Amino acid sequence: MLKVLVVDDEMLARDELKYLLERTKEVEIIGEADCVEDALEELMQSRPDIVFLDIQLSDDNGFEIANILKKMKNPPAIVFATAYDQYALQAFEVDALDYILKPFDEERIVQTLKKYKKQKQSQIETKHEIKGTDVTVEMHKLALPIEESIVLVNIEDIVYVGLVDGKVTVKTMRETYVTHDTLVILEKKLPQVSFMRVHRSFIANINHITEIQPWFNSTYNLIMKEGSKVPVSRTYAKELKKLLRI
């Protein structure tokens, strides 16, 4: 089953698209969102195969999400599902898989799913062809674009990554860096065995946690080795406690 996220600020449009997708019996709807902010949070939690994305959203437009996804290491496929036909060229400039127009047509959606499966099969065949020469290098450093240069930071020294005063900040044991990367990009770069998202705006290195303090309304604060505090939202508290077996 293909995992699908539906992003549209109109509930009726979301419901119609979900209905048609489920009729194909090839997809599982793992989430939906009506704005950019919620869509990005859903993306990080559910990791879909395909995102069906409207262009005009309540807080911005779908191209903001598409541009973020384009920078990810293994991004989901993007299918723009919109009432506007004038953005087709721009859609394919951000590597969209397909561009479908409202009102939705079931046969057209089936074609899109076939296109996705064909593309994935082609990628698998290409990987098999180069498998004999593929070399994996274990990286212990994170490359951070800082102003006009790139700084290499030891991954094990990173305490947390977060949005501080509106800027994406990487805090290490000794230094604080403000980077041009987004939280979404950094989450893809960091090893999941050591780092987890604990808040919409924070990713913590679990190896640096020394104390977990209850806060309010089922939220928490993490006390890190070098003394900083990292908030844990209700959304991520359960997953964190499960990971730490508490």
Curated annotation (Swiss-Prot):
Modification after translation (UniProt): Phosphorylated by LytS.
Record domain Response regulatory: where: 3-117
InterPro entries linked to this entry: CheY-like_superfamily, LytR-like, LytTR_DNA-bd_dom, Sig_transdc_resp-reg_receiver
Residue ranges constituting the HTH LytTR-type domain according to the UniProt record: 142-246
Main location group: cytoplasm
Cited Gene3D superfamilies: 2.20.25.10, 2.40.50.40, 3.40.50.2300
Gene Ontology cellular component annotations, sorted alphabetically: cytosol; protein-DNA complex
UniProt keyword annotations, A-Z: Cytoplasm, DNA-binding, Phosphoprotein, Transcription, Transcription regulation, Two-component regulatory system
Swiss-Prot/TrEMBL GO biological process terms: regulation of DNA-templated transcription
GO molecular function, one term: phosphorelay response regulator activity
Reported function: Member of the two-component regulatory system LytS/LytT that probably regulates genes involved in cell wall metabolism.
Protein name: Sensory transduction protein LytT
Annotated gene: lytT
